[in-house]
Amino acid sequence: MKKKRKYLFIDILMLIIMLGGACALLYPLVGDALNNFWNQQVINYYQEKSNAENREAIQQEEKRIKEENKKIAKMGVPGNDPFTKKKPENTTLEKDYYQKHTIAVIRIPKINVALPVFDQTDNLFLKRGAALLEGTSYPDGGKGIHTVITSHRGLKEARLFSDLPKLKKGNHFYLEYKNQTFAYKVDKIQTIEPTEVETLNIVEDKNYATLMTCTPYGVNSHRLLVRGTRIPFSEGMKKTLAKADRVHRNRSLAILIFSLLLMIGIGSIVFKRIKSLKVRKRS
């Protein structure tokens, strides 16, 4: 009897370890895939809203942005570091709240990133997507522009900017703003202290966009900056983005299907094992 109980305990322990291991393996993959689906809904809403605007509304918005960027250029000081400043965190989780604060879309095909860009840099938004660093330029096609887009790295439930270090000089990334798409070619990659904000200053005759996240991984004492200079958006780039969008969606869908099948398989094994244990216990 004692021997049977011992084997029963070992069997139950192995089943628990198997389930725990599967959950630990799948959690970051499934979490990221679900976050991607959620972000895609926010992006779709933003795109539909932008496409529905009439020409007069678009022209008024373009005028407002140019005036806002002129004010930002005169101030010449980017906002505080979003990863160290203490700011009250809104706990609202409704999707329409995020949709209301979405001002752009960042796409980085090289690392399979497509995220909504929010207008505030508090942790609520940074855990979901990317954000425009306060005090930096709105995306625009003119000169004297330096847009800074920031996001988290290393979250278990979402990759976000985790793969940003994989970008190299010459790679492209894109910002969708209203009904326009701006293309950027990476020309500078550097690591700075959180206080070295002068690196993000506007250069009078240039149009830059910088992607910012924490580094080193797990330590987060410094900031990784990947700067791109604006280049013309071509028809070939449009095709690249369409292909990257399909890959992005298919990858997330494949992860969810694989995870579901794996859990069904493990569940089947566990069910059969429990049934077998009950039979052994009766005998």
Task: List each model region and its residues.
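Short, Lys/Arg-rich, polar N-terminal cytosolic tail immediately upstream
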Residues: 1-4
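Solvent-exposed, non-transmembrane regions of membrane-associated and secreted proteins
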Residues: 6-250
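C-terminal single-pass membrane-anchor helix
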Residues: 240-283
